[in-house]
Amino acid sequence: MRLHEILKHLCEPAHMPPVNPEIAGVVYDSRAVTPGALFVAYRGFHTDGHAYIPQALERGAAAVVYEDPAWDGRVPVPALRVPNARVALAPLAAAFYGHPGRRMRIVGVTGTDGKTTTTFLTSVALEAGGAITGLMGTVDFKIGERMWTNDSRQSTPEAPEVQALLRDMAEAGCSYAVIEATSHALSARWNRLAGSAFDIAVFTNVTQEHLDFHGTVEQYRRDKARLFEMLAEFNDAAAPFKQRKIAVVNADDPHHRMFLDAAPVSAERLTYAVHAHADVRAEDVRSTRDGLRFRVTTPWGAADARLRLTGDFNVWNALAALTVACAEGVPLERCLAALERVPGVRGRMERIEAGQPFTVLVDYAHTPGAFEKLFRIVRPLTEGQVIAVFGSAGERDRAKRPLQGEIAGRFCDLVIVTDEDPRLEDRAAIIAEIAAGAEAVGKRIGETCLCIPDRALAIRTAFAYARPGDIVLLLGKGHEGSIIYGTTPVPWDEAAEARRALAELGYGG
């Protein structure tokens, strides 16, 4: 594809560089530049991409898009200065890959909690109707029957990776792509998902998270609501299957109205809930250690649901998936039959069984809202102890740390605070901030609140304290494959570490 064909989405012909080379890729990392690439240089949090323009040129970049006026006239290949190169990256990538989102129905799922499970369940429910789906989520990527681990530690990849995956999905015959849409990716500052051509937007819930990035809770909500605004991005009469837009929201969330209001007027609006009046509703919910039972009523019929998923919050996740699939024409009975076969999502209320007399669950919960939901569900499931092992990420929202400690302190008999990606922060200081929250609600440091930075030792300590019938929760890491110390990811597998610790106690042999 020629440079001018890509740039026409950013500027008028009069402002195009005079030379129009063939472009072989759109790249933002100079280390990934290959001959013929268009290099996009922008200012990041830790580094300034403009400093790597010389390296990109040495590696064969054929053109450069940049934002710093200091580089005017200094780039010896065709170059274009834009107000914000990071924002420009997504439309450039979408153009280069031929706007693949326009060839499929695109489903976006956003919210503080539940995105990963909802995305996975939505893919399963759509496939129950015979569709081939692609998926982008925190845990896995999927194209048709091929699934592989997302090792990037990004729930929503950078724009070129998003568009490349969409291209691969379209070429593999997928009729749907289901994308986990984070607030960072949706924000106007990063704009990673522009050009994806969304058709269905799903909202799960919103609580406090990522205030270090968004600044305020209100801005955080507005950034998430951009997914619903993006339903208006592409509506071409030449593609009739893309003209129907659907907004799906959790009516139990007090902020759901702002998400409905953000959708274009022409979009269909569907709600789901457990407590509030809604189009799709679960009633008579029963939760046990083994799964969920509930009655679901919908505009497409009513039925009894029996899921193998643990935790009441998965009722909302399942309702969201059912709403999307049924709205797209999949019969309710087929959706439920498919969802009933799902054993769970890796790192999401994942049960670790080795014959031990207590329950061990691995979950990605790492926000105050997720803690509140999780502990309220787990506490009634045992008359014994609830023991929680968790930490809080370094260089992220500090305000949530004491809240995590406070919530865990209220619901758990024993709180064990440990490392979770301290990065360049003082690991002891992070742990102390969390422990202060637990101490504020009556936990005693060294007795009912233990501070053990070594996560492997923290897990073993929890198991040593556990008695028959207790529940041990290993929170925050979930599916992730590393713990970041400084800038170095150290390999880590929470479920595998739990199994090793149980084996040391004589279980699982």
From Swiss-Prot:
Domain of life: Bacteria
Keyword Phosphoprotein part of the UniProt annotation: no
InterPro entries cross-referenced by the UniProt entry: Mur-like_cat_sf, Mur_ligase_C, Mur_ligase_C_dom_sf, Mur_ligase_cen, Mur_ligase_N, MurE/MurF_N, UDP-N-AcMur-Glu-dNH2Pim_ligase
Residues at which ATP binds: G111, T112, D113, G114, K115, T116, T117
Ligand binding (UDP-N-acetyl-alpha-D-muramoyl-L-alanyl-D-glutamate): S30, S155, T156, T182, R192
Keyword terms, alphabetized: ATP-binding, Cell cycle, Cell division, Cell shape, Cell wall biogenesis/degradation, Cytoplasm, Ligase, Nucleotide-binding, Peptidoglycan synthesis
Any one Gene Ontology BP term: cell division
One GO CC term on file: cytoplasm
Documented EC number(s): 6.3.2.-
Subcellular locations according to the entry: Cytoplasm
PTM (free text): Carboxylation is probably crucial for Mg(2+) binding and, consequently, for the gamma-phosphate positioning of ATP.
Pathway connected to this protein: Cell wall biogenesis; peptidoglycan biosynthesis
Pfam families: Mur_ligase, Mur_ligase_C, Mur_ligase_M
Family from the record: Belongs to the MurCDEF family. MurE subfamily.
NCBIfam families per record: murE, PRK00139.1-4
Name of the protein this chain belongs to: UDP-N-acetylmuramyl-tripeptide synthetase
Organism taxonomic ancestry: Bacteria, Bacillati, Chloroflexota, Chloroflexia, Chloroflexales
Gene: murE
